[in-house]
């Protein structure tokens, strides 16, 4: 005999113009698609959503009255719609509401509903798990915040494949992140083609999440993600000045002190040919500033060797930059022509063996730098996230290591741990890529 679970029921009040009605229909459709019941009665509802209007004074008064009635009759009220975008008028008048959003915020409203009235997951009837269908292990997930790119790097054809920058609404991004955290994900890896440009196309528009305004900009997005209480790691960060704004968040422990910035080269001539920003001198100054603000910061980057026109002098400048910057993690690629890329028009391609030899030499230089940096961690205690547990042992990662591209922490001994567990470990050895540690 099976015990039938009570279906969560949502009361709904919609005021205002046809555009408000359209927003209401989107919310109602999502509620029904997820299995929530809709009720015209306050009494039979587990909570009530009031879709408001704020166009004229009479509409504001009507909306505030409707919110008050819902609070009196039910007690659990979510407010959405135009009135929610007019400052703090709702919270000031009715501080007991659960949350407030602006208009066209269906996904944000659903996230709030999930928080206050989660629908029990039924593996027999629900086609999709709460966190969505994922290809990654259960304890970490990639969170794409935008699509496309506005740059015209000569070695890249991404803009022609994926189009210009299109940022996801911040409420949608945060709702997905919240679902992931609720499903047990311990680490979110923020990705896009150009993470630091997030929100540029939206003109940094303010949206609502959890009843609070959030600007569609990287700093504010990171602050909101930090409230989830899990690891947040930034990837594919273009070296804009705005990146400086997130470094204090790393210093405060709100997001991981990890920055993946693809510098690509250090020679001014080659950077110009690539149509990449900055110069080696300016970049070194910024790295020094980042480390001054957040001494624990880990900087990962990628470089291209053998780009068309790269001379021995250009390559020497790149090697000198590596030795000066002392980056923590580096990946390198020998230049390979891409059909449709403008770099194909820059001149004769360097011989393949030259391109590959330079890549190998760069990585050898970086191995020595990495070995010194990792050796400095011996005898320190660090936090790690367990990735794998089998009969051969336990493999984890530190805050300095992204999955698949960085190093690992191999744990000595046998103990009770599962993937997704956080552990405190003491580093006992290191090589140029990985750490070896014991649980403390």
Swiss-Prot record:
Annotated [4Fe-4S] cluster 1 binding sites: 17, 53, 82
4Fe-4S is among the record's keywords: yes
Stretches assigned to the TRAM domain: 375-440
Cofactor: [4Fe-4S] cluster
Record-annotated Radical SAM core domain positions: 135-372
One of the GO biological process terms: tRNA modification
Broadest EC class assigned to this enzyme: transferase
Entry annotated with the keyword Iron: yes
GO CC annotations on file: cytosol
Catalytic activity as recorded in UniProt: L-aspartate(89)-[ribosomal protein uS12]-hydrogen + (sulfur carrier)-SH + AH2 + 2 S-adenosyl-L-methionine = 3-methylsulfanyl-L-aspartate(89)-[ribosomal protein uS12]-hydrogen + (sulfur carrier)-H + 5'-deoxyadenosine + L-methionine + A + S-adenosyl-L-homocysteine + 2 H(+)
Binding-site residues for [4Fe-4S] cluster 2, renumbered to this chain: 149, 153, 156
Cofactor binding note of this UniProt entry: Binds 2 [4Fe-4S] clusters. One cluster is coordinated with 3 cysteines and an exchangeable S-adenosyl-L-methionine.
Entries under InterPro entries matching the protein: Elp3/MiaA/NifB-like_rSAM, Methylthiotransferase, Methylthiotransferase_CS, Methylthiotransferase_N, Methylthiotransferase_N_sf, NA-bd_OB-fold, Ribosomal_uS12_MeSTrfase_RimO, rSAM
Record NCBIfam families: 30S ribosomal protein S12 methylthiotransferase RimO (TIGR01125), MiaB/RimO family radical SAM methylthiotransferase (TIGR00089)
Recorded family membership: Belongs to the methylthiotransferase family. RimO subfamily.
PANTHER family in alphabetical order: RIBOSOMAL PROTEIN S12 METHYLTHIOTRANSFERASE RIMO (PTHR43837), RIBOSOMAL PROTEIN US12 METHYLTHIOTRANSFERASE RIMO (PTHR43837:SF1)
Protein name, UniProt field: Ribosomal protein uS12 methylthiotransferase RimO
Phylogenetic placement of the source organism: Bacteria, Pseudomonadati, Pseudomonadota, Betaproteobacteria, Rhodocyclales
Record gene name: rimO
């Amino acid at each position: 005999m099976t015990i039938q679970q009570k279906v969560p029921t949502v009361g709904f009040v919609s005021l205002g113009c046809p555009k408000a009605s359209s927003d209401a229909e989107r919310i109602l459709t999502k509620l029904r698609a997820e299995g929530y019941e809709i009720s015209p009665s306050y009494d039979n509802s587990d909570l009530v959503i009031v879709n408001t209007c704020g166009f004229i004074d009479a509409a504001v008064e009507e909306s505030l009255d409707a919110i008050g009635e819902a609070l009196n009759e039910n007690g659990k009220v979510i407010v959405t719609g135009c009135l929610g975008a007019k400052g703090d008028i709702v919270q000031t008048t009715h501080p007991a509401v659960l949350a407030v959003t602006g208009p066209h915020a269906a996904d944000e409203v659903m996230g709030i509903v999930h928080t206050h009235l989660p629908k029990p997951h039924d593996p027999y009837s629900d086609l999709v798990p709460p966190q969505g269908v994922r290809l990654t292990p259960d304890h970490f997930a990639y969170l794409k915040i935008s699509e496309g790119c506005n740059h015209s790097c000569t070695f890249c054809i991404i803009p022609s494949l994926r189009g210009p920058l299109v940022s996801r609404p911040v409420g949608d991004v945060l709702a997905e992140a919240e679902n992931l955290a609720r499903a047990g994900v311990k680490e979110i890896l923020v990705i896009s083609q150009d993470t630091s440009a997030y929100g540029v196309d939206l003109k940094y528009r303010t949206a609502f999440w959890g009843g609070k305004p959030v600007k569609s900009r990287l700093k504010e997005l990171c602050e909101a993600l930090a409230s989830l209480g899990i690891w947040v790691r930034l990837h594919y960060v273009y070296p804009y000045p705005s990146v400086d704004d997130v470094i204090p968040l790393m210093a405060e422990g709100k997001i991981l002190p990890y920055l993946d910035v693809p510098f690509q080269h250090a020679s001014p001539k080659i950077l110009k040919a690539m149509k990449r920003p900055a110069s080696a001198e300016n970049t070194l100054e910024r790295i020094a500033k980042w480390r001054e603000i957040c001494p624990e910061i880990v900087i990962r980057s990628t470089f291209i060797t053998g780009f068309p026109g790269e001379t021995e002098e250009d390559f020497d400048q790149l090697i000198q930059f590596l030795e000066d910057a002392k980056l923590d993690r580096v990946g390198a690629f020998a230049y390979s022509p891409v059909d449709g890329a403008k770099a194909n028009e820059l001149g004769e391609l360097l011989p393949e063996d030259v391109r590959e030899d330079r890549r190998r030499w760069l990585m050898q230089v970086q191995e020595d730098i990495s070995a010194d940096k990792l050796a400095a961690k011996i005898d320190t205690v660090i936090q790690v996230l367990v990735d794998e547990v089998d009969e051969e042992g336990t493999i984890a990662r530190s805050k300095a290591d992204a999955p698949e591209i960085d190093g690992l922490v191999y744990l000595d001994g046998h103990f009770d741990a599962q993937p997704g567990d956080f552990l405190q470990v003491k580093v006992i050895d290191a090589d140029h890529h990985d750490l070896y540690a014991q649980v403390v």
